[in-house]
Amino acid sequence: MFQQVKTSEPSLCKERLETFRAMRGMTHSVLSTKVLHSYLGDLKKAEAEGRNLLTEKYARMDNRIPPLKTNRLIDDIVRLESRWMKELSQKYPHSLGAGSGNFELYLSCELETYSDETLKQYFSDVSRAMKEVRNLAEERYTKLFQQIGYSSIDEMDRNRSLID
């Protein structure tokens, strides 16, 4: 789906497909099997209907089309995920402190492409993490940075502080 997305500006992710895959993998790496199975169903359904969910997401981000869905869980998920991202940006200012300005818009538009069932399962994962005092964003970035050779976000942040 991603390769078919037409953008008005060049996309670094489209030029570096491995970066796109790493970021998508990071995003999904902390979600339950229930969420992933439901989302796979969303992707298969969209493909059968001739829809490209990524095209729809980016069209929403550019405000080219009206909202795809209204579901209170979208706002709830975005609020909780944003809280986690804010915590990370304060904790790791050199590696995660900047560039998150569009996070809420990006996530909201992404979630609009999910089915109600996938949103329900995703919210369940986020709620469980909150009760367990876990930060899913931190878990995602830990996995990503470990993939590229760092032992932790803290190590990445220390290295970035030497550059800044």
Task: Name the predicted role of every residue range.
Residues 13-16, 24, 46, 72-73, ...:
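N-terminal low-complexity, charged segments
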Residues 28-44, 73, 77, 111-126:
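Short, structured motif recognition centered on aromatic/hydrophobic residues
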Residues 7-31, 39-42, 102-107, 111:
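A cross-kingdom feature marking solvent-exposed beta-strand/loop segments within repeated
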Residues 80-164:
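Long, low-complexity acidic/proline-rich regions
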Residues 36-71, 126-160:
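Repeat-associated, polar segments at repeat-unit boundaries in modular proteins
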Residues 11, 18, 52-55, 60, ...:
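Low-complexity, charged, repeat-rich alpha-helical/coil interaction segments
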Residues 1-3, 7, 62-91:
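Extended non-catalytic interaction/regulatory regions in multidomain proteins
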